[in-house]
Amino acid sequence: MKKPKPDPLTYSELRCAAVDLLSRRDHSRLELQRKLRPKAASAEDLDNLLNELAERRWQSDERFAESFVNSRVHRGHGPLRMQHELRSKGVGAA
């Protein structure tokens, strides 16, 4: 039996969900968009929230990329693999 689809989150609830995700680790804008889209009441709310997070510097693709690369270097991943993974997360190769 299928579970009923939950009601969309208000803007405030959506912000709390985003902050909860960002409190665990940095996320790219695209990652947040993919994770929050099913919960958002509208695409406009989600876009406004992502802009707000970037303006407040709570979310930064640059900071995400630096953290991501550092973690992958320690795992021994090569530059081509890291570039591919970054592109899949919505961050251009540096």
Predicted regions and their residues:
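An alpha-helical, amphipathic repeat domain used for nucleic-acid recognition
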Residues: 1-94
